[in-house]
Each structure stands twice: as structure tokens, then as C-alpha cells.
Amino acid sequence: MVEFLELRGVEGATVLEIGGGVGEIQIELLKRGAARCVNLELSPAYDEEAKRLLREAALEDRAERRLHDIAAEPDGVEPADIVVLHRVVCCYPDYERLLGAAAQRARHLLVFSYPPRNVVSRLFVGAANLAFRLLRREYRSFAHPPSAMLGLLGERGLRRTFSYHTPVWRVAGLER
């Protein structure tokens, strides 16, 4: 993801990361010249570790962390040159609202990762969700249809110019 974005140009860019966790991608993009990063989370669970990592990298003045559901309230977020969603779409039930809001905020580039939709991933998601249900946890995982996700982004003016595959994850880089 970072390499794709760097090849397209991150110098002076604004970055919006949706579900960035502790912020490894944001820190890398800031180190490579991005001007500013905003990270949106649904939970404060990663905040302390993220703040520590930003402090250690001396980048805390160029990063902002917010609790915000962009799919529910897209207008509460400023557009950015680059939008990143790494291992997030699989955690959100309504990929159409999530990716639609992300596309709406992407001025130039959007990159996201997702699990392949095959027998293995569907079995894994089903087993994981059964375990979460038995443990009475609310979290659920999703293997959304890649062609539908990419089609939705295409309808919003983004075209795929990069793809990367591993056995467990797919990465799509799109440009406006």
C-alpha cells in the first residue's frame, strides 16, 4: 500500500485513514513526505499505543486521531488527497456506505485491502463469526464481493490502477 502511494506521490499530500489502528501506515506516509494525516476509528482501543508511536517518531503535530463513523456521518470529515482503508472493509457490515463515503472524500487516490471471496475465506469468516457468537461478542467479520466493491468505487469516479494479491489479502489502488 505504502509503495503504491509513494509511487503516485505523497509529498505534501493530506491523508485520511479509516480504521488505521495504531497508525503504522500513517507514520510511514508522514515519514515519506505526507503533510498531514487524519485517522478515524470506531473505538479508542488503539489511541494510547498510537500516541506513543507518533511521539517516538516526532510526528504527533502532523497527525490527528478521531472517533468517527464515516459511513454514518460522511459530512463530518474533510476530503483528503489520499484515503486508506487497510483491513477495514471486512470489519464493516455495509461496505457500500463505507466505501461510498471513502470515495466521496478521496481527491486523488484510494487504496484498500480486503479478503478474497473464495471458499477458504468464507469458511474462515463463518467459523470466526460462530466463535464470536458463542463468546457473546458483537464483532462480526465479512467477506464482501470484490467485484461489487470495485464496481461501486468505479461508479464514483475511481479507476483501479494497482492490484496486489496474497493468499489471505487483496489490495486495490485506485485513482481519480
Residue ranges and their predicted role:
Residues I82-D94:
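A short SAM/SAH-binding and catalytic strip from SAM-dependent methyltransferases
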Residues A72-V77:
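Short conserved loop adjoining the S-adenosyl-L-methionine
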Residues V22-D69:
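Class I SAM-dependent methyltransferase SAM/SAH-binding core
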Residues A13-G21:
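Conserved class I S-adenosyl-L-methionine
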